[in-house]
Amino acid sequence: GGFGGLKLANKLKKSGFQVVLVDKNNYHQFPPLIYQVASAGLEPSSISFPFRKIFQKRKDFYFRMAEVRAIFPEKNMIQTSIGKAEYDYLVLAAGTTSNFFGNEHIEEEAMPMKTVSEAMGLRNALLANFERSITCSTERERQELLNVVVVGGGATGVEIAGVLSEMKKFVLPNDYPDMPSSLMHIYLIEAGDRLLAGMSEDSSRHAEQFLREMGVNILLNKRVTDYKD
């Protein structure tokens, strides 16, 4: 139900095929704007689009909310959480998940940013920490709640670091006037030698300059090997 699945389903319109889309959610998520949900800039409904509404005029389209548990290619069959289904052609467009590079500890403790629910988890954690920090008795306790580390200098990492810096600069002074925004520190850690490695060097340079001007602490050529609370 991601970009690949939707594009194929649309391309098969009037092809004579019966198209069955299987997804664990009954809506499509728009990944490029998930970071806006995490920062409370957008509500989840703004980037979530129900499959049935998208394809409601298609008589050749069927949707089933389920998870695929097993594939039996010799039988042209899949086993899902709601039962079995036969197919003539099977297309796997499951999307991606966060890569923790085998570090189970970080996987357990970190907050990934691939889905709307994960973005909401980050949003709720941030807002809860803001509220808790107001009642802390010492500056050190406040800082422990307000330090945010973003690992990965790709598009998502740069975007979330950017909106967090905007929250620090514009939201905190207005919504939390009794808490100095200077206590919030944002770190962006990238294992490579530049941000946005998949884009042009000019884009990387502008992104780094903007984030530094916004107060983000950028650490390049640094790998995160573990996490300790």
Regions found by a protein language model. Name each.
Residues 1-62, 69, 155-199:
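Beta1-alpha1 glycine-rich phosphate/pyrophosphate-binding loop at the start
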Residues 28, 227-228:
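Short secondary-structure capping/turn micro-motifs that flank functional sites
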Residues 30-34, 38, 97-102, 106-112, ...:
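Glycine-rich, flexible loop/turn motifs
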Residues 57-72, 212-227:
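A conserved beta-strand/loop element that lines the FAD pocket in flavoprotein oxidoreductases
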Residues 61-149:
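FAD-binding core/adjacent interface of flavoenzyme oxidoreductases
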Residues 112-113, 117-210, 214, 218-220:
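Predominantly flavin-linked oxidoreductase catalytic cores and closely associated redox partners
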